[in-house]
Amino acid sequence: MAQITLRGNAINTVGELPAVGSPAPAFTLTGGDLGVISSDQFRGKSVLLNIFPSVDTPVCATSVRTFDERAAASGATVLCVSKDLPFAQKRFCGAEGTENVMPASAFRDSFGEDYGVTIADGPMAGLLARAIVVIGADGNVAYTELVPEIAQEPNYEAALAALGA
């Protein structure tokens, strides 16, 4: 269990992020078309998981926009993962014109538990904590960041550097 804060108030996650150097947990997420997004699709490629509570909050929306801009320049593969319904993610990305990130919903799978990012208590219980996981082309975790305060943005530069972007 990891501890983070929401506006200074301590809350917990259900576990810990996977360790750097360990095999990344397999995942199955849902895309905006309700199709399956599987970790198998990215074998042999590096991928950045931008994990957050909801696209309908300002900091989360900023992270999607920022990674969209940065991914365009680098050609990086970025999945934006939240518990939002795929319809909400698709609406947001359509309205924002994002084209370089892939929205991926964890609304019906064990992603949050497998990656240790489901919030266990407090007003956001059940949603995902703000975190970054970079999975290398070898399938191992290359970088992680559990953002200590949900209202803060992740370290974009460190995440993209770990991705090699």
Curated annotation (Swiss-Prot):
Disulfide bonds join C60-C93. The active site is at C60. The keyword Chaperone does not apply. InterPro entries: Redoxin, Thioredoxin-like_sf, Thioredoxin_domain, TPX, Tpx_CS, Tpx_Peroxidase_subfamily. It catalyses: a hydroperoxide + [thioredoxin]-dithiol = an alcohol + [thioredoxin]-disulfide + H2O. GO terms for molecular function: disulfide oxidoreductase activity; peroxidase activity; peroxiredoxin activity; thioredoxin peroxidase activity. GO terms for biological process: cell redox homeostasis; detoxification; response to nitrosative stress; response to oxidative stress. Thiol-specific peroxidase that catalyzes the reduction of hydrogen peroxide and organic hydroperoxides to water and alcohols, respectively. Plays a role in cell protection against oxidative stress by detoxifying peroxides. PANTHER family: THIOL PEROXIDASE. HAMAP family: Tpx. Belongs to the peroxiredoxin family. Tpx subfamily. This is Thiol peroxidase. It comes from Mycobacterium tuberculosis (strain ATCC 25618 / H37Rv).
